[in-house]
Structure formats: structure tokens, C-alpha cells
């Protein structure tokens, strides 16, 4: 029987594009007989190979820089607009050669569709192969770069690439994405499946805990917590002080979402992946404001309006009074509303017509 492939291009910017894509790939593996050709950065693919190792016989990987995203200043959350633009110019110029190489590699494969989250390379490859091409995201780089007044030629190149999408799977908290003119399907929140046995073990072993993350794309000099005696789980890139029970999760930890779900309070950059993991696990969420980032500001505004999160300024990380934060979270976050949301992982394959 001929192998049928789903080709998936995932942004190499940060890590949460990959983690939510892994949730979808898991379901493709469980619900269909498709093989998956996964293209992303070397760092992201290394994580994916380990996470999906039980499906190794149906996976093929290619390491490739698929996005620039937003470049941040050293040891901070602020976007370096000049450096972002500096890196985008040669990246856009490289698309033609990258797409040509991908088409040569894929042209003899039987392909069901091309998925992209949300690198323009996937949209361009799908168009060249003349197969259905589906975008998946809560934003595109068009509105992100417009917000920062990136060169118009760069923005037009992204618009042109996205114009080849046949369908767009829109995650929760989506920006308006006016440049997307294909049909859309609403997906909601999507995250990797939780291991409730592991979560129970973590709670028993560590007791009360916090989860602090700023994502793998940025580094923060220091976070200082005050008046807290529980365990603090942190991801790489953060130096946390103020507690003698700090556990830094290794960069290759496969299930940070289980540690998040075992925690009483989640303090994080307002990226979509961590938000989705927290919301679907019904966790009280404290988001770090980055007024310079359109997506983060939009996410925080929506979640606060819906009583699903509270926010703090980046400057407050120097002295986080945890009892005060917990009081604010208890006052302003509605557990009733939080419990209305669920992980759409098992529904997305059918929703996108892959089954």
C-alpha cells in the first residue's frame, strides 16, 4: 500500500509552535495511517524526535531555519526591531532556493496536505506542489511585523506567501489576521496530553509549587520571589532567587506541561503555548506584560477581560510577592470560567479534514 504523507512546516522561532504542533502530530499518528514529514529548526526537531520516538517508523525530519520571528534584546523580553529586520532580509531572500529544494525532495511522495505553523515556507511549498495547504496559528507574521513597522517589502513577501493557503485553522485568542483571505476553522485551545499519574506523583513529591517560564526564545537575568516556601519549577533561561527549593527543568525535559499542571500558580510570558497548557489544565495564570509585542498584549487583554488570568510588568519580576499574587489571582480569576475550557487535541484531526 502506498504511503500517504502529511507535510508539516513548523516555525523555528521559540518552542511553543513546536509543542502545539506535537499535540496535533500525536493525534495524526493515533487516528490515521499517515506518515509525517516534519520540517523545523534543529533544536525544535531534536525535541520532537525524542517526544515522538514511539512513532519513529512513521516520521521523517528535516532541520531547517523556517522563521526569524521576533528577536529580543539580550537578557530581556523587549523586541530588538533593528536586529529582527536585519535577520529578515537574508531570510526572505533565501525562500526561493529553500522552496526549490523542498519541492525536489517531496515531488515523488504521495501527499495528503501541507500544514504550516506559521512559516511562509510551508505555504510556498504547498503552492508549488499543488496540494491542499493549511495554515495553523493564532497570528501571522504580517500583523506582527506591521506592528513594528518592518520594511514594507518584507511584509509584502509574507502576505504573498500566505495568500497561497487554502484553509486556516484558527487557534483561540487569534489576532484579526486581515491578510488571511482563505476559509477559516476555529480550533480553540490545543496542547499535549497530560499524564495525570505523573502529575499526582509530582504533587505528592514536591507539595505546593509554582511554575515560572519565559519560553526558550528569551533569557531573563533574574527573578526574585518573596514570602514563598514551596517548590519553584523553572524552565531554562531564567535565574530564580528567593527560595531554597528551586528546580530548573533541563532543556530536554519532554513533559514540562506536566510540571505546569502540578503547580498551584503559573507565571509566564504571554505566549500562546504556555497559555493553552495552563488554561486546559485549569491553572491560575500570571502573565508578564510585554507592551512591545502585539500578540502578548492581545492575549493578556482577552484573558483578563474573560477573567482567566492576571498580569504583571516585567519590572515586577525583581520582587515577586507570591502571597500577594495569589490573592490577586483568587480575586480576579474565575475558576468557573476556567473550567469551561478543554483541550481540543482529539478533535483537530477531523476538523482539518485529515480523517
Which sequence ranges carry the predicted segments?
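Nucleotide-activated donor-dependent transferases that construct or modify glycoconjugates
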Residues: 2-14
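C-terminal alpha-helical cap of glycosyltransferases
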Residues: 322-328, 337-355
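Short amphipathic alpha-helix
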Residues: 18-28, 44
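Donor-nucleotide binding loops and adjacent catalytic segments primarily
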Residues: 25-26, 190-265
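A nucleotide-sugar donor-handling region in carbohydrate enzymes
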Residues: 144-217
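Conserved nucleotide-sugar phosphate-binding/catalytic loop shared by glycosyltransferases and other
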Residues: 30, 34-92, 315
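Conserved nucleotide-sugar donor-interacting segment of glycosyltransferase catalytic cores
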Residues: 101-159
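A donor-sugar binding/catalytic signature common to diverse glycosyltransferases
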Residues: 114-117, 258-298
